[in-house]
């Protein structure tokens, strides 16, 4: 019974919440080998910039005394859409905890301006998918997490052509000039003859690199610039010390998926997105 537990909510997460959520995520991942998309680092970064939506509650918690046993959080990259993801400690499941967390979030959603909920679940999470199925949410799209080992890329033809030297590969892109345009966000812009053809965001945490938001301007697509910018990004991260490199790709984007797999990236996990429109949630 959920009456035995304490439910709270907050505008954003603090350092204490962060630690507790990470511990809860570890327990859940150890239990059923699934991934979550909690965006905790993004949330704390936005809170530090005072850019969090403070008009209402975005983080929902369930405690058994001082122990966090359930969590459901909102991430909003678009003011009209909320992405939500959460979890319940394995030994506390089937007690209605997640249902109560979702009910509280739904009340908040219906009282505020966003028009759509995107519910996220790892495709291997039986409990997550069962919950979403009960809501009759509509499938929206899927997103792969893909990973590349630096050692695999070092066997890549273009890398071998440059003697396994990432610096040489970076310099070889004589027609593609890539410069950092936002040091805080680690954004890089690629140009050809002074014209912007694309951009990418790179991250390095310990020895894990990340490639995000790789985008080629529409009129320059289909000319090999996406592959050139991807290879540049991989070589750049390797030169910075990355041993593995991760990225995310929408499974509906067949061209990008083929590009990444041909470069050596392999699927590590898949996150499924399901949609609920506000008109369908009122009264639930």
Q: Where would I find each of the regions flagged by the language model?
A:
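Conserved donor-binding loop and adjoining core beta-sheet/short helix segment
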Residues: 26-103, 107-109, 121, 200-209
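Glycine/small-residue-rich hydrophobic helix-like segments
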Residues: 184-244
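Active-site acidic-Proline motif in GNAT/NAT acetyltransferases
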Residues: 89-91, 95, 204, 217-219, ...
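Conserved GNAT acetyl-CoA-binding A-motif
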Residues: 81, 109-123, 238-248
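Conserved beta-strand-loop-alpha-helix junction that forms the acyl-donor binding cleft
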Residues: 118-129, 247-257, 273-280
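Conserved acetyl-CoA-binding loop-helix of GNAT-fold acetyltransferases
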Residues: 94-107, 134, 216, 222-235, ...
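Short amphipathic alpha-helix that is part of the acyltransferase structural core
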Residues: 1-44, 138-195
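Conserved acetyl-CoA-binding loop of GNAT-fold acetyltransferases
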Residues: 132-142, 261-270
């Amino acid at each position: 019974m959920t009456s035995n537990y304490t439910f709270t909510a907050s505008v954003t997460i603090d350092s204490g919440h962060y630690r507790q959520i990470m511990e809860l995520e570890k327990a859940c991942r150890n239990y059923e080998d699934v991934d979550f998309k909690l965006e905790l680092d993004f949330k704390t970064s936005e809170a530090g910039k005072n850019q969090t939506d403070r008009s209402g509650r975005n983080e929902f918690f369930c405690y058994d005394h001082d122990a966090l046993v359930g969590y459901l959080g909102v991430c909003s990259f678009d003011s009209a859409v909320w992405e939500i993801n959460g979890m319940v400690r394995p030994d506390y499941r089937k007690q209605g905890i997640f249902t109560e967390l979702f009910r509280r979030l739904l009340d908040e959603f219906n009282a505020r301006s966003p028009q759509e909920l995107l519910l996220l679940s790892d495709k291997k999470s039986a409990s997550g998918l069962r919950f979403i199925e009960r809501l009759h949410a509509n499938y929206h799209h899927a997103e792969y997490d893909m990973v590349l080992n630096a050692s695999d890329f070092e066997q890549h033809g273009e890398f071998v052509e440059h003697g396994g030297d990432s610096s040489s590969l970076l310099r070889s892109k004589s027609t593609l000039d890539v410069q950092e345009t936002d040091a805080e966000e680690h954004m890089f812009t690629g140009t050809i003859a002074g014209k912007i053809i694309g951009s990418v965001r790179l991250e390095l945490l310990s020895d894990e690199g990340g490639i995000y938001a790789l985008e080629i301007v529409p009129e320059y697509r289909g000319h090999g610039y996406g592959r050139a910018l991807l290879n540049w990004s991989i070589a750049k991260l390797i030169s910075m010390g990355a041993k593995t490199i991760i990225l995310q790709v929408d499974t509906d984007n067949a061209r990008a998926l083929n590009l990444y797999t041909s470069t050596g990236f392999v699927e590590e996990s898949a996150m499924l997105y399901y949609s609920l429109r506000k008109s369908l949630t009122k009264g639930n």
